UniProtKB/Swiss-Prot annotation:
Compositionally biased tracts (Acidic residues): 73-83
Family: Belongs to the small hydrophilic plant seed protein family.
The entry's keywords: Cytoplasm
Name listed for the protein in its UniProt record: Late seed maturation protein P8B6
GO CC term, one of those recorded: cytosol
Biased composition (Basic and acidic residues): 1-18, 37-51
Length: 83
């Protein structure tokens, strides 16, 4: 855990627009950046749990579906990863 002095220095840097916490981009203070990073991490993990790791990986490879194709047509175009 950061000491009071370190927190104050990090807070000052964050107020100048610097990202001082990985994943805390956009936070206007050290504490705000911590909360943003925690929420982003938790949100990604929750999404992964909902889809399962296989679905999460497929979503990353595939991207969004196109409006001119149905899901079935998209699946037919997708190369099969099963053996």
């Amino acid at each position: 855990m950061a000491s009071q002095q370190e927190k104050k220095q990090l807070d000052e840097r964050a107020k100048k627009g610097e990202t001082v916490v990985p994943g805390g981009t956009g936070g206007k203070s050290f504490e705000a950046q911590q909360h943003l990073a925690e929420g982003r991490s938790r949100g990604g993990n929750t999404r992964k749990e909902q889809l399962g790791s296989e679905g999460y990986q497929q979503m990353g490879r595939k991207g969004g579906s196109t409006p001119d194709k149905t899901d079935k047509e998209d699946a037919e175009d997708e190369p099969s990863t099963r053996t």
